[in-house]
UniProtKB/Swiss-Prot annotation:
GO cellular component: endoplasmic reticulum; mitochondrion
Main localization (coarse): endoplasmic reticulum
Purpose of the protein: Multifunctional sorting protein that controls the endoplasmic reticulum (ER)-mitochondria communication, including the apposition of mitochondria with the ER and ER homeostasis. In addition, in response to apoptotic inducer, translocates BIB to mitochondria, which initiates a sequence of events including the formation of mitochondrial truncated BID, the release of cytochrome c, the activation of caspase-3 thereby causing cell death. May also involved in ion channel trafficking, directing acidic cluster-containing ion channels to distinct subcellular compartments.
Name of this chain's protein: Phosphofurin acidic cluster sorting protein 2
Subunit structure: Interacts with BID and PKD2. Interacts with SIRT1. Interacts with HDAC1. Interacts with TRPV1. Interacts with WDR37.
Species: Mus musculus (Mouse)
Length: 862
């Protein structure tokens, strides 16, 4: 960090005789530091600057710049505070950007952190002239200290910003609200008494001033809101002239009570007893980068508490969705009125209209959130409730005589920008969750609490089963009869709650033990789209963690239905192939009638238990990145982008404007049907054969999952332009070793495609030195045959040309015509209304591999 203050030299015009008050703030840009890193506040007070020698001719003013490397450590080099004399750079008597350092001095912060200097101290500033330091100036330092930031002060300073109005920013919300709620952070064990930080009297005075100022602002805001509500309160005479006042006055009073209670919950420091300075002091969590994905805070009480986050949270079942965050502030004091209950019943009975109002309209989002909020139990504990799925209404009609809510949760949520990488896992266009909001079921938490018994001991394995289809329901029934650690998930909220709880328990184990935990084996039983949901949660959660977390979990793939990753694992591990890729297993979970005739259910349990106990070899599956750019909903709106991790296959389809229906905006609808294809496409099947074979929507093939209902299978022709860059082969890299830049070649395909498929799965079991992808395309070609008599050309269609291109490092795909939108299938999850997309062979964060357990790298002998 650096801060500059301009000072005038003696005798120079505009010299300042009064001290310049400045506050120095560090930009927290560190994520790889140790969990014990504690933010500190450096306070520096300068008294006088004395220039002993002439710095430069015709120098009228100088700038005092203070610079510190952040983070600084107690026992490491570079822990220095630099104070520099600088001047603005000039070119031909014109001031340009930048500063030139005239003299500099440094202070060892390791000594300051242990013994703050309160007396007078003189720092010599030296100028380097011909590699010989010459003392040219001196600075008198009154005080210099470095103190940990008080958790209580930070919360109090954040109070007026994050909880008063909508004028706060997202950065303030994340840094003060979300971070401090993360009670599973390693810093949470550092409960220190306030006297430990009591170094000097100015610190106490500053704390009391900050607390008094923030509480004054909160009280002023509350008084303004109360005065505003009373100003618009309808008098009883007016109510008597309209209707019976008994019908409306209680509702108004309940609304006011709800508002007051909400303000009291959100501003707990308004009253007298809370002003006593007797609470313990917590250090704030370590500074970190803005997360790639914005998820819920990893609270240790996550198995019991759920809350409302936003209407965008549950966007993509069965892909991960944010578990709500705000119910904690709404529980306890709310009373459900009859009017609200009637509103819930009416809105739940209204069917969803196909062409309703946009999802971002405040009417739709606010009404949905209000209904969902009031339906929650008064305690706010999810463990008390069963699954709650409430259809939202698309119409703006309300019951006659009913008043709207005076406050809504939407008004207290921070604005979330669209083009934000942190929001990339929140799909903003999913149709399923526009029609319903979900919260985790009680049975999920019951199963988790039964498996995760204590913080001191972690289970060896956990089996997550997707019970939203018949395959998962059948498998869960079989496994539960044998008392295996099964967690049944049937919605995005269930998956989110289960995975977040596992991560939270691992964090609590790390906080209680000095040794790292033994890797927890997490079996994922479901189709490809279910693994995609787990992968996104894995990337989201571990992007906030240190690299050590990459070794705390191992995943086991139990395929139920179409699963390209399972086919790949079968090609590198023959025992895995015999267990889960043989004909008996595929027939059992691909044909609905097969389960009724199955008598040997112990064989299923035996395969799974042998796989869990015997698969101890970690196969690092590379994670690729897909960046989708959606069309804007209005001309004034910018295009939104999403970053999606994937490990398997990406397929492309196209939607013509003529065949576009109201469902075109329903992107990211998971291709999970209750009936799976009886013959899932294998890796050896040609793309043309896949195109011609009729498959149900659950199959991720282009013909079944991407074609419009009005289009035939043979009419799936796509006019695309594909730009791709191929990485150099190992032999080419040796030949070009002398070159600095890695050679890449750009190629372009611009033609009519029958199918386009990009795979990140390695071509062989061994990981390549350079991360690359492979692309398989089937193009439609025309052969121009010359007719000599009429001398005209006649187009004759020939067989489709199939082509496989390997070694691709980056790929960009867009439609030939801008009005055509793409449908992209990423690991079994469909996304539509895509203008163009880009694929990169490697994920950009430190989470670059997905650890999967196999028996060993041994190819099958067949």
């Amino acid at each position: 960090m650096a801060e500059r203050g301009r000072l005038g030299l003696p005798g120079a015009p505009g010299a300042l005789n009064t001290p310049v008050p400045m506050n120095l703030f560090a930009t927290w840009e560190v994520d790889g530091s140790s969990p014990s890193c504690v933010p500190r506040l450096c306070s520096l007070t300068l008294k006088k600057l004395a220039v002993l020698r002439e710095l430069e001719k015709e120098l009228l003013s100088v700038v005092i710049a203070v610079k510190m490397q952040y983070p600084h450590f107690l026992k490491r080099e570079g822990n220095k505070l630099q104070i520099m004399l600088q001047r603005r750079k000039r070119y031909k008597n014109r001031t340009i950007l930048g500063y030139k350092t005239l003299a500099a001095g440094s202070i060892n912060m390791a000594e300051v952190m242990q013994h703050p200097s309160e007396g007078g101290q003189v720092l010599s500033l030296c100028s380097s002239i011909k590699e010989a330091s010459v003392k040219v100036a001196e600075i008198w330092i009154v005080s210099l200290s470095s103190q940990p930031i008080d958790h209580e002060d930070s919360a109090m300073q954040a109070g007026p910003k994050t909880k008063s109005t909508d004028n706060y920013s997202e950065e303030e919300y994340e840094s003060f609200s979300s971070e401090q709620e993360a009670s599973d952070d390693a810093v949470q064990g550092q409960d220190l008494d306030e006297d430990d930080f009591d170094v000097g009297k100015p610190k106490k005075q500053r704390r009391s001033i900050v607390r008094t100022t923030s509480m004054t602002r909160q009280q002023n805001f509350k008084q303004k809101v109360v005065a505003l509500l009373r100003r618009f309160k309808v008098s009883e005479e007016v109510l008597d002239s309209e209707q019976d006042p008994a019908e409306h006055v209680p509702e108004v009073e309940e609304d006011l009570d709800l508002l007051y209670d909400t303000l009291d919950v959100e501003n707990p420091s308004d009253s007298g007893p809370d002003m006593d300075d007797d609470d313990s002091v917590l250090s704030t969590p370590k500074p970190k980068l803005r997360p790639y994905f914005e998820g819920l805070s990893h609270s240790s009480s996550q198995t019991e508490i759920g809350s409302i986050h936003s209407a965008r949270s549950h966007r993509e079942p069965p892909s991960p969705a944010d578990v709500p965050e705000k119910t904690r502030s709404l529980g306890g004091k709310q009373q459900l009125s009859d009017s609200v209950s009637d509103t819930v019943a009416l809105s739940a009975a209204v069917p969803r209209e196909p062409s309703g109002q946009p999802e971002d309209s405040p009417e739709a989002e606010t009404s949905t959130l209000d209904v969902f909020t009031e339906k929650l139990p008064p305690s706010g504990r999810i463990i008390k409730t069963e699954s709650l799925v409430i259809p939202s209404t698309r119409s703006e009609s309300k019951p006659a005589g009913r008043r709207g809510r005076s406050t809504s949760l939407k008004e207290r949520q921070p604005a979330r920008p669209q083009n934000e990488r942190a929001n990339s896992l929140d799909n903003e266009r999913c149709p399923d969750t526009r029609s319903q909001l979900q919260i985790p079921r009680k049975t999920v938490y019951d199963q988790l609490n039964h498996i995760l018994i204590s913080d001191d001991q972690l289970p060896e394995n956990i089996i997550l089963v997707n019970t939203s289809d018949w395959q998962g329901q059948f498998l869960s029934d079989v496994l539960q009869k044998h008392t295996l650690p099964v967690v049944c998930t049937c919605s995005a909220a269930d998956v989110q709650a289960a995975f977040s709880t596992i991560v939270s328990r691992i964090q609590r184990y790390c906080n209680c033990n000095s040794q790292p935990p033994t890797p927890v084996k997490i079996a994922v039983a479901g189709a490809q789209h279910y693994l995609s949901a787990i992968l996104r949660l894995f990337v989201e959660q571990l992007s906030h963690k240190t690299p050590d977390w990459l070794g705390y979990m191992r995943f086991l793939i139990i395929p139920l239905g179409s699963h390209p990753v399972a086919r790949y694992l079968g090609s590198v591990d023959y025992r895995y192939n015999n267990f889960f890729q043989d004909l008996a297993w595929r027939d059992l979970f691909n044909k609905l009638e097969a389960q009724s005739s199955v008598q040997d259910t112990p064989d299923i349990v035996s395969r799974i238990t042998q796989y869990i106990s015997g698969a101890n070899c970690a196969h690092q599956l590379p994670i690729a990145e897909a960046m989708l750019t959606y069309k804007q909903k209005s001309p004034d709106e910018e295009s939104s982008q999403r970053f999606i991790p994937f490990v398997g296959v990406v397929k492309v389809g196209i939607v013509e404007p003529s065949s576009a229906t109201s469902g075109d905006s329903d992107d990211a609808a998971p291709s999970s049907s209750s009936i799976l294809s009886s013959t899932p496409p294998s890796a050896s099947t040609s793309p043309a054969a896949k195109e011609a074979s009729p498959t149900p929507p659950s199959s991720p093939s282009v013909s079944g999952g991407l074609s419009s209902p009005s289009q035939g299978v043979g009419a799936e022709l796509m006019g695309l332009q594909v730009d791709y860059w191929t990485a150099a082969q190992p032999a080419d890299r040796k030949r070009d070793a002398e070159k600095k830049d890695m050679p890449t070649t750009k190629n372009t395909l611009k033609c009519t495609f029958r199918s386009l498929q990009v795979s990140r799965l390695p071509s062989s079991g061994e990981a390549a030195a350079t991360p690359t992808m492979s692309m398989t395309v089937v193009t439609k070609e025309k052969n121009k045959k010359v007719m000599f008599l009429p001398k005209k050309t006649k187009d004759k269609e020939v067989e489709s040309k199939s082509q496989c291109i390997e070694g691709i490092s980056r790929l960009i795909c867009t439609a030939k015509h801008q009005q055509n939108m793409l449908r992209v299938l990423i690991d079994g999850v469909e996304c539509s209304d895509v203008k163009f997309f880009q694929l990169a062979a490697q994920w950009s964060s430190h989470v670059k591999h997905f650890p999967i357990c196999i028996f060993g790298h041994s190819k099958a002998t067949f």
